[in-house]
Amino acid sequence: MEGEQQQQQQQSVAAVRPSLGKAPSPSFRLRNGSLNAVRLRRVFDLFDRNGDGEITVDELAQALDALGLEADRAGLAATVGAHVPDGAAGLRFEDFESLHRALGDALFGSLDVPEDGGGGGGGDEEMKEAFKVFDVDGDGFISASELQEVLKKLGMPEAGSLANVREMICNVDRDSDGRVDFGEFKCMMQGITVFGA
């Protein structure tokens, strides 16, 4: 029975990649080294919109949509369903952890990051792509209101107060102009990668 369930989970995970409406941005890769249990729990809590301790297919689809990863509902239902225990309405945290481990490269591509940065400056291209997600108006800077808008889309509680968002900006704003330029963003992201690993 357990071997059959594992095979079903593997097949459903393999079906996810073609069900995505577009290829996931490399900027949103889940990197095993930097996504520990505490961070995964925070992601789970964000995706669990109604706070009932389970993530339904609808809640997961809404979260993926907010990240720009439109997924086919049928494929998503099959993948999630393979990890939902009998009698449960959705993924509990331990099921979500199992799904996260199973998805690995199937959904987000290779998780290996070459030590030289990927050759040809690919790391900078990924960083620029991530920066563009936050630089909503395309002016080359991330303002507090732009950051707040993205945080709202992601359902993050930090988005509730513009003063808190401004404080977040101040923490990385080296030239004190009240906004984050690409260099400041890059330093911040490299710090997250180093300290989060």
From Swiss-Prot:
Ca(2+) 2 binds at residues 135, 137, 139, 146. SMART domains: EFh. Residues 35-70, 122-157, 160-195 form the EF-hand domain. One of its GO terms (molecular function) is calcium ion binding. Residues 1-28 are annotated as: Disordered. The gene is CML24. Ca(2+) 3 binds at residues 173, 175, 177, 179, 184. This is Probable calcium-binding protein CML24. It comes from the Eukaryota. PANTHER family: EF-HAND CALCIUM-BINDING DOMAIN CONTAINING PROTEIN. SUPFAM superfamilies: EF-hand. Potential calcium sensor. Gene3D superfamilies: EF-hand.
